[in-house]
Amino acid sequence: MLDVTLIVLCAGNSTRFEHKTKKQWIRIDNEPLWLNVTKRLASFSNFAKIIVASHEDELNYMRNFTDDFAFVKGGDTRQKSILNSLQFVTTKYVMISDVARACIPQSVIENLLEQKESADCIVPVLNVTDTVIYETNTINRDEVKLIQTPQLSLTSTLKKALDTTIEFTDESSAIKAINGTIKYIQGSNESKKLTLGNELDELPCLKEPSKNFFTGTGFDIHAFEDNKVMFLGGLKLPYDYGFKAHSDGDVLIHSIIDALLGACGAGDIGEFFPDTDLKYKGIDSKLLLEHIVRFIYNVGYEIVNIDTTIIAQKPKINPFKHEIKNSLAALLNIEKQFINVKATTAEKMGFIGRAEGVAVQSIATLKYYNWKQK
């Protein structure tokens, strides 16, 4: 086994990507890009450890995909993500790559590893073939290099180099700043960094997402409580009683949230918004749903449709169905024709039949966001 740890940085917000989904979560067949890239790099050599640095909101979800990697909370900059990851590195060397470089060839990895003892940092580069002008001066293009990742560094030197408040854009710049030794090796055009959405077609190693559909169910039930405002589907209903709950008690929204989370395999509402957390006390459930919808899109899905059944002896739901559908369509960012709201009673049986509360059953269908068609 190599005395080398591989770190893959996946904590970015994809602000320049111009797609609904973060670049690290676009699907390559059935795999998110971060998993596809990390497995690809892992297959090229026998690394001692593989660390994936991710956005805090996505860490637990990532763990659903594999137990083969360690997951670390990333920072709000590339350098902070590296620093967080380095706390868990005990090997002599560390190789750091960006998830946005999806098609790195095996030859680059092998060359980096072969040269690991020749300098403090080994860096793949490309030469410039076009004329280069800085302001009004023509620069000798033979002196210009395009720096790529992954880069392989001596762990102790990199830790020392990053012990600073100065932000660097790559490891070699930090190591060079403390007079560490740098060795440049030949990079590859295949290691192109994915930044803008229209660059996806320039990465031939990426397959289009599968056309699978994913279905989840959600169920919630709440008792009535007098002298509270009733919220249902994001609407305020004209009654002098509402739902007993830690939040505002919107039983319909809670059911839909669980259905959405079930469809993408992300757990349940309590894992995202625990009722032991005071910041969710009395919270508007529309905010919870908006958070989950953003999460759904961020991690690579689109909402296909929602079907929901409200089980209530009271209040009567039919007068509000149209408004509920409009409210949900706006919250879910889908057309209302893809939302169905049904209502039934419990035929005066049990808790619901005695008009003590309401239950809701929801079904959500998702599909992968198809970046090939955008």
Q: Which residue stretches match the model-derived regions?
A:
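Short, conserved loop-to-beta-strand elements that form functional interface hotspots
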Residues: 307-316, 321-352
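C-terminal edge-of-domain segments
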Residues: 353-373
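RNase III-family endoribonuclease catalytic core
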Residues: 204-322
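Short aromatic/hydrophobic "clamp" motif used to bind/position activated sugar donors
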Residues: 94
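Conserved core of the sugar-phosphate nucleotidyltransferase
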Residues: 44, 104-186
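SAM-dependent methyltransferases
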Residues: 1-7, 11, 40, 170-172, ...
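N-terminal glycine-rich phosphate-binding loop and ensuing alpha1 helix
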Residues: 2-57
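Conserved N-terminal catalytic core of the sugar/cofactor nucleotidyltransferase
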Residues: 33-91
